[in-house]
Swiss-Prot record:
Signal peptide: none annotated. GO terms for molecular function: O-phospho-L-serine:2-oxoglutarate aminotransferase activity; pyridoxal phosphate binding. Coiled coil: none annotated. Its cofactor is pyridoxal 5'-phosphate. It comes from the Bacteria. One of its GO terms (biological process) is L-serine biosynthetic process. Belongs to the class-V pyridoxal-phosphate-dependent aminotransferase family. SerC subfamily. Its main location: cytoplasm. It comes from Lysinibacillus sphaericus (strain C3-41). It is an enzyme of class 2 (transferase). It catalyses: O-phospho-L-serine + 2-oxoglutarate = 3-phosphooxypyruvate + L-glutamate; 4-(phosphooxy)-L-threonine + 2-oxoglutarate = (R)-3-hydroxy-2-oxo-4-phosphooxybutanoate + L-glutamate. InterPro entries: Aminotrans_V_dom, Aminotrans_V_PyrdxlP_BS, Pser_aminoTfrase, PyrdxlP-dep_Trfase, PyrdxlP-dep_Trfase_major, PyrdxlP-dep_Trfase_small. This is Phosphoserine aminotransferase.
């Protein structure tokens, strides 16, 4: 086999090699059925077992209480930008959005179709280099909800702690750091996440929603856009992304077999430190975008001091087997996405490349 790439893609992103190899082994004949999991009816007993195993394991790994539902939807986090306000924001209500990057801006924009979104806080004036201080977040007790984006892939920032919103439901887009660290689910009314960074391949959107919110959701909206439709049918109202759910379940098994979410967090801290140390010890040759207290463990964003040298850095890195180091097209620069499945060895190899490149060109 060709040597595996050092995959730092921002999403879809690296998957555990052992999960890929297991899927390869099971691809043609799944559980002695004579069929691939991709060929099976989503109403079959075998897929039903796969589906329910994945839900149960996510609940176990994240200690999700009984008063929450886990849904497997489609449309990505981008559809959740619409579904959240469509279900919970009426024309005479406000919802508070914390703006910490491009994705929170997109969510904010979608909410305008349904009610009145207001800025609870924003760090746009600081080029989204940091997460707003908890004390700066403003919202009213009668807000429909408060919305945050827990990790910002483009700018490389991440929430360490979450706001206490009291009786106002806290909604979080956790697409890029779900399952990267333990969290207290009960702080949140709703969590949503596209799978393609930490949970599996693209095509599945995970929603964790408190049951009392389901009871309050708008009933006068299209059937497929109601959370209750999917909660009442165990996410099987229509044909689900069967292979994606199977892969998600296998990734969850991998997390469990490698020590669970607490162990994942420790590995992520170590991986990120390896690269951040290379930036911090470079005497300004590499410059991080995010302020240190807001640095993401998932997306490490930086610039090379000289623009022409930065282009050379990215070209040589690509030639050396590093994939996905270009920053987002909207901001440029460099970005190393170190999601759960990215091995420490890849981060150490990137560190060594960065140090070597600096020594050659400083």
């Amino acid at each position: 086999m060709t040597q595996r790439a050092y995959n730092f893609n921002a999403g879809p992103s690296a998957l555990p090699q052992e999960v890929l190899e297991k899927a390869q082994q099971q691809l043609v004949d799944f559980r002695d059925s004579g069929m691939s999991i991709m060929e099976m009816s989503h109403r079959s007993a075998i897929f039903d077992e796969v589906h329910n195993e994945a839900i149960a394991l996510l609940k176990k790994l994240y200690a999700i209480p009984e008063n929450y539902e886990v849904l497997f939807l489609q449309g990505g986090a981008s559809l959740q930008f619409t579904m959240v306000p469509m279900n919970f924001l009426s024309t005479d209500q406000k919802a508070s959005y914390v703006l910490s990057g491009s994705w929170s801006e997109k969510a904010f924009k979608e909410a305008k179709f349904f009610g009145t979104p207001v800025e609870a806080a924003s760090t746009k004036d600081n080029q989204y280099r940091n997460i707003p201080a908890l004390a700066d977040i403003q919202f009213d007790e009668d807000d429909a909800y408060v919305h945050i984006t827990s990790n910002n892939t483009i700018y490389g920032t991440q929430w360490r702690d979450y706001p206490d919103t009291g009786n106002v439901p806290l909604v979080a887009d956790m697409s890029s750091d779900i399952l990267s660290k333990p969290i207290d689910i009960q702080k949140f009314g709703l969590i949503y996440a596209g799978a393609q960074k930490n949970l599996g391949p693209s095509g599945v959107t995970v929603v964790i929603i408190r049951k009392d919110l389901l009871e309050k959701a708008n009933k006068s909206i299209p059937t497929m856009l109601k959370y209750t439709t999917h909660a009442d049918s165990n996410s099987l109202y229509n044909t689900p992304p069967t292979f994606g759910i199977y892969m998600l379940g296998e990734v969850l098994k991998w997390v469990e077999s490698n020590g669970g979410v607490t162990a994942v967090e420790k590995r992520n801290e170590l991986k990120a430190k390896v690269i951040y140390d290379a930036i911090d010890n470079s005497n300004g040759f590499y410059k991080g975008h995010a302020t240190p207290e807001s640095r993401s463990l998932m997306n490490i964003t930086f610039r090379v001091a000289d623009e022409e040298l930065e282009k050379q850095f990215l070209a040589e890195a690509k030639a050396a087997g590093f994939v996905g180091l270009n920053g987002h097209r909207s901001v440029g620069g460099c970005r190393a996405s170190t999601y759960n499945a990215v091995p420490l060895e890849a981060c150490e190899a990137l560190r060594d490349f960065m140090v070597d490149f600096q020594q050659k060109h400083q």
